[in-house]
A protein has these predicted regions:
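One-carbon transfer enzymes
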Residues: 1-264
Length: 264
């Protein structure tokens, strides 16, 4: 059954958001709108700088190199997915113009204009492709589905797959598709997807494998979300806060430990 979907995009050039938009349409769903954060704002710069200037600059350089690399091996996992699924790389606005999808470009996902945009479109569900923290007002307007790059409920927060490696909990590496709530990574879990490690895998390659799996797993979970939203979310989907822990950005020494543990 077709759902009325809003895609929340991190940036104009977000490969994840573009893949979610295109694949939702291929699966027969209606993408009724896109909410996108404006790239150059003081608020966004402050958010990006919370991990430090070096991390911020490294992120920019990595994104540029991945985007303009002609090699599948050097692209992000999302870029690889686009290429192997014949999705032309272009801006979110360009794709929306082709499909006549309205776009709301906003300073914050929680702005009044974003809330009004959602209310006028009456969507069934929003898919989160990044763009910052989501507050209660937006969550009260529409259910929002997110893909967490770790297995919930145990690993919440930042870099959960690296923390699983640091702790040598290899069976806790994977993706979790969940509905969002204001408490970070604590919404009902729709689906857990373990990811198997490969021989001689690097941290970079593991992250790419996780990224590559995100788009198809999110699209597959739409049917689960639709079923639960039409009926009732089973009790077993709800997380207990004490079943997991909130993790933060790991120190470089711990990242090196994760890489070492990956090769064991």
């Amino acid at each position: 059954m077709s759902m009325r979907i809003i895609v929340i995009a991190a940036t104009e050039q977000s490969e994840l958001s573009l893949g979610l938009l295109e694949m939702s349409l291929r699966e027969g769903h209606q993408v009724v709108g896109v909410i996108m954060r404006k790239t150059l704002t003081l608020e966004r710069l402050k958010e990006e700088m919370r991990f430090g200037l070096v991390a911020f600059l490294k992120k920019i350089v990595t994104k540029i190199l991945q985007r303009y690399s002609g090699s599948v091996e050097e692209q992000s996992g999302w870029g690889k997915f686009l290429q192997l699924n014949s999705i032309a790389r272009r801006s979110i606005t360009s794709a929306c113009n082709e499909y006549n999808i309205p776009v709301c470009k906003t300073v914050s996902l929680n702005s009044i204009e974003a809330l009004l945009f959602v209310k006028t479109l009456t969507p069934t569900l929003a898919i989160f492709g990044g763009g910052g923290l989501v507050r209660a007002k937006l969550l009260n307007c529409v259910p929002i589905m997110n893909c967490h790059m770790g297995l919930l409920p145990k690993y919440r927060g930042n870099y959960p797959w690296i923390w699983a490696l640091i702790n040598k909990e290899y069976d806790q590496i994977g993706l979790s598709i969940h509905l969002m709530e204001e408490r970070l990574d604590l919404g009902p879990i729709l689906r857990n997807v373990p990811i198997k490690l490969s021989k001689n895998q690097s941290l970079f390659q593991l992250r790419k494998d996780l990224e590559y799996a995100m788009i198809p797993e999110i699209i597959s979970a739409l049917a689960i979300a639709e079923k639960y939203l039409d009926d009732k979310i089973p009790e077993g989907c709800y997380q207990k806060e004490l079943d997991g822990k909130q993790y933060y950005v790991p120190h470089n020494m711990l990242i090196k430990l994760a890489e070492k543990n990956l090769k064991i």
